[in-house]
Amino acid sequence: MKTYAIIATEKGDMKAELYADETPGTVANFVDLAGHGFYDGLTFHRVIPDFVIQGGCPRGDGTGGPGYTIKCETSAPRQRHDRGVLSMAHAGRDTGGSQFFICMNRENTRHLDGVHTCFGQVVEGLDVIDDIRRGDRILSIRIVRE
């Protein structure tokens, strides 16, 4: 059984397979936050074309988090920042919490490999990332197991 996140946004829905077996701490944290509605209504506060869309900051400016930090899991398999990969944002090793980004372009994100934890991959609705603009809202993130 696989774990997926259904990320509903103002621009459409994305379905991402989460790497629960490979990055268990990061996925457990994301699933817990999503399950408690943490992400509901938050914005994509950082959008850089051909690089990333980033959300998950309760302050909406990139400085907020859940009030705790989690460890990086960068030695796991599938740690390539390809287009559509979900990765944990942080301000330095082991400082991630709730902010995550989705990669738009492998060429411009390869330098993040081994630095940020890749914890999922968009498998449906990948075109939505191209439509997201700064300030667009995450309506909800729902976790499903199939």
Where in the sequence are the language-model features?
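Cyclophilin-like peptidyl-prolyl cis-trans isomerases
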Residues: 1-146
